[in-house]
């Protein structure tokens, strides 16, 4: 029975991940966003020249991700709350439905067990993703929605990130994207997690352009200052610094 319960729990987790990312997709579309990519675990569906293609990608700290291309900025603004919280909203809605199904079919052992697991996990997903917090190396949806609602520059940075993601999905390299997207934010602005990501992308663009010395100086600066750089991005910057050092001076104090 324990083994069966474990399998049912894994199935419930997977279903709620799909529901969560589906919520981002549905509420993103309602908000005027266009589909870019949809990932569950390491399976990612992307739009490429009007066709949906399957790719493989694993991102640490996330079970799934739905990325969409944002609408054009109007007076420096775009709708962000529904897109960011759409996953949690869908988890809550589905949890209520599954709880109702449990109440109706509570006499059927395995089905009722799956329904209550789906309801509980749905509520858990809604809380963990909807209540603003930093989860390991990435910020959750609630944290993003809160950051965007407080900072106009962060909102602009969010738009840039989504456009970069859209172009990357289409196979466009960073060095071939608009230079205006990669302006390094001020040290003060870098304290915002969303804006800090643009600084990281600026480093990535310099790396793609093989301007390694400039990239190394910028990465060193960004890693030293008090910033909101997410743990995942910070670790990737460290990896890039190691790479630059290995192909350059190989200074022991750096390595």
Tell where the protein language model's regions lie, with residue ranges.
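Generic helix N-cap/helix-start motif at coil->alpha-helix transitions
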Residues: 191-200, 229-239
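Hydrophobic alpha-helical transmembrane segments
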Residues: 1-7, 107-121
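Alpha-helical membrane-embedded segments
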Residues: 114-134
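Charged, amphipathic alpha-helical linkers/stalks
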Residues: 144-195, 199-203
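Small-residue-rich helix-interface/hinge motifs
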Residues: 8-72
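Juxtamembrane/interfacial segments flanking transmembrane helices
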Residues: 34-36, 130-155
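Alpha-helical repeat scaffolds
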Residues: 176-186, 212-225, 250-255
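Residue-level signature for tetratricopeptide repeat
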Residues: 205, 243-247
């Amino acid at each position: 029975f324990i083994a069966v319960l474990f399998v049912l729990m894994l199935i419930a987790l997977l279903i709620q991940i799909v529901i969560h990312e589906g919520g981002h997709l549905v509420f993103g579309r309602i908000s005027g966003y266009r589909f870019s990519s949809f990932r569950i675990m390491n399976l990612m569906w992307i739009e490429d020249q009007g066709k949906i293609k399957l790719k493989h990608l694993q991102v640490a700290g996330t079970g799934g991700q739905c990325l969409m291309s944002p609408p054009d900025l109007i007076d420096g603004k775009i709708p962000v709350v529904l897109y960011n919280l759409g996953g949690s909203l869908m988890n809550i809605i589905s949890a209520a439905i599954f709880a109702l199904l449990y109440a109706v079919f509570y006499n059927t052992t395995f089905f009722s067990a799956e329904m209550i697991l789906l309801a509980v996990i749905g509520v858990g997903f809604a809380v963990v993703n909807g209540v603003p917090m930093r989860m390991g190396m990435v910020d959750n949806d609630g944290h993003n929605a809160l950051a965007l609602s407080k900072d106009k520059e962060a909102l602009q940075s969010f738009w840039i990130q989504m456009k970069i993601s859209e172009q990357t999905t289409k196979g466009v390299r960073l060095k071939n994207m608009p230079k205006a997207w990669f302006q390094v934010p001020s040290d003060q602005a870098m304290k915002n997690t969303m804006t800090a990501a643009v600084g990281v992308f600026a480093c990535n663009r310099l790396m793609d352009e093989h301007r390694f010395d400039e990239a190394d100086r910028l990465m060193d600066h960004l890693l030293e200052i008090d910033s909101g750089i997410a743990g995942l991005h910070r670790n990737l910057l460290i990896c890039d610094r190691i790479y630059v050092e290995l192909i350059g001076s190989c200074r022991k104090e750096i390595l």
